[in-house]
Amino acid sequence: VYGLGADASNDAAVRRVFEVKGRPSDHPLIVHLSAASHLDAWAANVSSNAKLLADAFWPGPLTLLLERSSSVSPAVTGGRPTVGLRVPDHPVALELLRSFGGGIAGPSANRFGRVSPTTAAHVIADLGDDVDVVLDGGPCRVGVESTIVDLTTDRPVVLRAGGVSVDRLEEVLGCSIGIFVSAEPSTGGARAPGMLEAHYAPNARVVLCAEHEIAEVLIEVLGSATGPVGLLAGSALVGLPEDIVELEPAGPADDY
């Protein structure tokens, strides 16, 4: 997804990111690097697991949570002793990082709690004149956030699901990994991005129903709708009105 970037070594620039997003200051940012060779400058301890995952998935949608170096500002990490690090795989982002030469703190480029943008137009529509420059790299290929893996514990733990699956992580590490399933209270900060009780919330009404109730619910929803209506179903449905946007899983439901 598109990111809202700032010099990770400049506290004033980092504070501006929090201000523009409306993001709590105790909600840490991910630092983006141009290559895995820069890990030692940001992490106090780069474990063998970190090296394995970096070699396998960087550049790519994987963030490694490691103990932060003493030179990393608490403004970036939300006051926590850990830092999230990633090497993105988009050519424009990589060229920017190489030209800049340092780390760029970059959460998704949207107001805090809203859906992450996948085009430059989404960024402009949400953030407008609050950002100095919008670098248009075209539509995003993935469209979801990076997977975050905590490597500061004895057993690696996925803190946020994303572009790299648990199966692929376990295949590279050769062991099972944990999955964090409980959201932390919003008043207590978060160990990593995407871990608050409410996150990535679209500004839309959502109705859950059983398959046999779909027709009845659609009649009710369409009667009060003031905009587009989408339907996410486990299998294809027939006889839907033309103004319904229908989505269905690309694979077996168990995969989700």
Protein language model annotation of sequence segments:
Residues V1-Y256:
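Active-site-adjacent structural elements in enzyme catalytic cores
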